[in-house]
Structure formats: C-alpha cells, structure tokens
Regions:
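Gly/Ser-rich "nucleophile elbow"/oxyanion-hole loop immediately N-terminal to the catalytic nucleophile
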Residues: 82-89, 162-179, 197-201
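Accessory cap/linker subdomain of secreted extracellular hydrolases
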Residues: 208-313
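Catalytic-loop region of hydrolases
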Residues: 27-85, 344
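Short beta-strand element of the alpha/beta-hydrolase
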Residues: 77, 88-100
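C-terminal catalytic histidine-bearing segment of alpha/beta-hydrolase fold enzymes
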Residues: 297, 301-305, 330, 337-386
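Gly/Ala-rich beta-loop-alpha elbow adjacent to hydrolase catalytic centers
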Residues: 178-182, 186
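Short beta-strand/loop motif that positions the catalytic acidic residue
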Residues: 316, 321-324, 328
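Alpha/beta-hydrolase active-site loop
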Residues: 147-168
Length: 386
C-alpha cells in the first residue's frame, strides 16, 4: 500500500480543529426529496477497503439528470476511517469512479476494487478522510447508465453526498476526487453544485485523466483518427458503443445496423451487459476499430450526443487540480492540456501537473504526491476564511 507519513495526518487533524464549528452542517431533508436517505446497510466485505473502520452501502433519492425530472433511487458506498471521530465529523473525499460499464451489476459498490483504486482510496482513508463513493445513475440502480452524461453524473453524485451527510458523522467540507470518467463526473458536479445543491461546501476538486468536449471537439473526432485502418483493436471503441446505447435509450427507432458494421453490431449488444474490462477484451480480441466497426452515420450520431457530454460551466468557485500523464492515449494528453487552459481562462484557480512517461492508469497514484498537499493546503485556507 502507498501511505503518507503520520505527520500529514496530524496536520490534517490540526486543520480540523481550527475549522470546528465554522462550516454549518446540513439540516435533514424531507424524506421524499432528492438527496434523502432510503436505506443504509453494511457493504459486502469483499467490496470494501482495508483502511476503513466501517463501510456501508446506501440507497438514496435523486432526480434523473438525463431527462431533468424523473425521480429515481441511486446507490453509493460510504467508508469511515479508523480512529476517533473528530469533533464536527470527518472531512469528506467524494470519489467519482472511472468507467466500469453501463449495466447495473457493474457498479463499484457491487464489486471488489482494483489494486489501483484500492491503493488510491486507502491512502485518503489513512489520512483521515471519509469517502463517499457514488455508483452513478443506472449502476447499482434501475435503468441504463448514460455514459458521460454530465448532468446525469452530477445530480446523482451531489445527491449521494446529501444523503451521506444526513446519515454519518461527516463534515460538510468536501473534496471532489475523480479519475477518467470520474474526473468528468467530478468537474460536472462542481459546475452543477451551486444551483442543484447550494448547501454543499466544496473546498477543492482533484482530477486525473479528465475528458473534455467543447464546441471545437467532439466524440466523433476521438474515433475518426483510425477511420482508415482495418486491423487491430481500438480500446476506445467500447466508449462509442456506450454513447450509442445512451442515444438508443432516449431516441426511439435507432437501429444498431445503421451505425455499426455486422462485425461490431454483436459487440454492441454485448456492451449493454458486459462490464468494461470484459468488453474491452472482446473488442480487442475481435480486432474492432473505427475503420472496421463504425458506419458513416455513426459520426453524426456521436455529434448529436456531445452536448450532453459538455460541462455546464468552466468557471468553478474553488481551486481545481489537474493531473495528466504525457503518455495518456485513453484521454489524449492534448485534450487535457486544452481543458486546463480553458478552465484557467474562464477564471478558475487551476494547478496542473504533468507526469512524464505515465499513461492513463499510471498517473493516478503517482499524482497523490502533488494532490494530497494541494487538498491539505486548501482545507487550511478554507478554515482561515471561515
């Protein structure tokens, strides 16, 4: 495991003492309102974390961010650190996970953590942060998960935090932390929070491997680069399938054969049921890439879906950390650099770190050497302001 020195935890404890009573706790919500708790049970031990003293699965009420109105119930895991609860409650890391699939059984709360994710999350727990880990709408809950739907991610994430704050000894002092799709979900949540969940107090946001779609980039462009190739699998093809499935879920009459070649169409059906690792292996084994999988109409379909992938705003009222591997091909490094530039231009306080030679996965845990001090500095500054 990768843990930080005890001194850092003592420093965090000092920040908590300084800030006790300075940040108001949330009042209990009406039992039928978004963010209200429906059920709290013990999380299956095999899906837990080594550094957690207690771990729970919660079910809570939310609203569908996909259609903007339908009531739903979503799920999240909550991890409580070891040690005595600080006065005022534990500070919170809101962990927004990377791509796992679109089928309900792919939810992180229903599966063991990968070694990478376990190492990362145990580090935050060992530093004295509680973790709220939303599954996202459609994962662990009813309906199809709409991949990279910014509002859909954000509303479910924010409601999970409201529910957790009402049920556990947590401080309304939040750090959003996300990797890959989770970085997208974290930044989307930061953007929607002032209007959708104004009582939540977000101190900072930490992003690694963050996707970005503006009016000059699109999902179509991501897959167009390999359009002429016919050999070799492309690990990004599952994402095109997920975006198609989201479109088909909300648009009647879409026919998979209009958008995918016969070679790929069978895997689109599999994409609804398989989690990401199994689907990616199948795509690679079948040698699927843009050139042999996507029909011309797919580009238009992907273009039509990109508005739902875009962030509501780039101007965030708290500092944002961006960690990028220079060898990231899953979310191209150049896309992340453009994101950092545009977010800073919008007036957000940005701290960006590039990790030479590291890819999408390798960047995540190495970035802790910079993101942990970033988070602690901002907690300290926040305590002084209040």
């Amino acid at each position: 495991m990768f843990y930080f020195p005890q001194m850092l935890r003592k420093l965090l404890t000092l920040f908590l003492i300084i800030s006790v009573g300075m940040i108001p706790l949330l009042s209990s919500a009406e039992t039928t309102s978004p963010g209200s708790l429906v059920e709290k049970t013990t999380l299956d031990a095999k899906n837990g974390l080594q550094e957690a003293a207690e771990q729970y699965l919660i079910r809570y009420r939310s609203l569908s961010g996909v259609d903007g109105k339908s009531p739903r119930e979503d799920t999240a895991a909550v991890f409580i650190p070891k040690g005595e609860t600080p006065k005022g409650g534990w500070p919170v890391v809101v962990w927004t996970h990377g791509t796992v699939g679109v089928q309900t059984t792919c939810a992180p709360s229903l599966n063991p953590h990968s070694g990478r994710d376990g190492q990362y999350l145990n580090t935050w727990l060992s530093l004295g942060f509680a973790i709220v880990a939303p599954d996202y709408a459609g994962l662990g809950s009813a309906g199809l998960h709409h991949y990279l739907n910014a509002r859909g991610e954000a509303w479910s994430v924010l409601d999970s935090v409201k529910a957790a704050l009402s049920a556990f000894p947590l401080r309304n002092q939040l750090t959003l932390v996300g990797q890959s799709q989770g970085a997208h979900a974290a930044f989307a949540s930061a953007g929607y929070q002032p209007d959708y969940a104004p009582n939540l107090h977000i101190v900072s946001t930490v992003l690694t491997g963050v996707p970005y779609f503006d009016d000059k980039t699109s999902a179509a462009a991501i897959f167009a680069g390999d359009a002429g190739g016919k050999e070799g699998g492309d690990p990004k093809i599952p994402y095109a399938m997920y975006i198609y499935l989201s479109a088909a879920d909300t648009t009647k009459g879409l026919n998979v054969d209009d958008y995918f070649t016969p070679k790929a169409a069978a895997d689109v059906s599999a994409a609804r049921e398989m989690c990401i690792d199994e689907l990616t292996k199948k795509v690679m084994d079948d040698g699927l890439n843009a050139g042999n999988s996507l029909k011309p109409a797919t580009q238009g379909l992907l273009e039509s879906q990109t508005p739902s992938l875009r962030y509501s705003t780039l101007k965030i009222a708290h500092p944002v950390f961006i960690g990028t591997g220079t060898q990231d091909i899953d979310v191209p490094t150049i896309m992340q650099r453009v994101f950092a530039r545009d977010v800073a231009k919008a007036g957000t306080s940005v701290e960006m770190h590039e990790y030479k030679g590291l890819d999408h996965t390798g960047t995540m845990n190495v970035s802790l050497r910079d993101s942990v001090p970033f988070v602690l500095r901002n907690l300290h500054a926040d305590a002084k302001k209040h």
